[in-house]
Amino acid sequence: MAEFNHVTVLLHEAVAGLAIQPAGVYVDATLGGGGHSGEILKQLTSGHLYSFDQDETAIHYNQANLGPAIEEGKLTLMQTNFRNLKQALADQGVTAIDGIVYDLGVSSPQFDDAKRGFSYQHDAPLDMRMNQDQPLSAYQVVNEWSYQELVRILYRYGEEKFAKQIARAIERARQKQPIQTTMELANIVKEAIPAAARRHGGHPAKKSFQAIRIAVNDELGALEDSLEQALALLKVGGRISVITFQSLEDRLVKTMFKEATSLPDLPPGLPVIPADAQPDFKLINKKPVLPTEDELKVNHRAHSAKLRVIERLK
């Protein structure tokens, strides 16, 4: 069994953001190593937690890790993508929830398990699937997607300004023979980026690997679907805590939360906004919560984390 030495980022802040009711119904949308689930379970008495993860490694690990809570009937593990949130909960007889937490991005064990192919630090087959049962892998994206599709995902999901050069280099390399491994891909990307640009900004393949991973797992599409369902499922007083690790995710969450907390178009000059026109949701923090200096010292992966929390008012 894979060992989850995953340090959960903003653990206490994210769970505190949910304002847990001991008898409430909660969801951990991203089970991973069970950090948030374990913290939520400590605060539940007669409540119940549904913890989602499409990665069977996380499910198997937590069947043992959180076994006592499962036996007590306080926890149900759900092996499915969180974009299936509404249907998966309905199958359990749940149509409303008191809170849900999202901890986005790849969990450390997925990065650290070389054979999963998420990292440019280890040589491994090109895979990057969070759900290992799905057919689409990084191998197909890199070897079969067109030049135009590669440029699109590198720009859109990697914010990579050398997207065209990288896509062209991938196209040239795969015409000779298929690109099989993460190291092959990392070297192709590195060579495609001008030498001057390689000297700063971290590993030259970082943005490309992020872009391909997001494309393989449709991460942004899944997040948008899931958040829409979560907003609809929330009871009055219920909250959503979302931890993001990169600007694309954070922008999506910020936009969706802004939309949910905005006033409708009203005639100008109204002295008082009628109660039924008030927004259904409010932001708990105007600005995102960031990790403390102490947390950054012990967890280098926390540096880009941001927490946003929203509450249903009516």
UniProtKB/Swiss-Prot annotation:
Primary localization class, coarse: cytoplasm
GO MF annotation, one: rRNA (cytosine-N4-)-methyltransferase activity
A GO biological process held by the record: rRNA base methylation
Subcellular location: Cytoplasm
Catalytic activity entry: cytidine(1402) in 16S rRNA + S-adenosyl-L-methionine = N(4)-methylcytidine(1402) in 16S rRNA + S-adenosyl-L-homocysteine + H(+)
Entries under Gene3D superfamilies matching the protein: Putative methyltransferase TM0872, insert domain (1.10.150.170), Vaccinia Virus protein VP39 (3.40.50.150)
Keywords: Cytoplasm, Methyltransferase, rRNA processing, S-adenosyl-L-methionine, Transferase
Similarity annotation: Belongs to the methyltransferase superfamily. RsmH family.
Protein name: Ribosomal RNA small subunit methyltransferase H
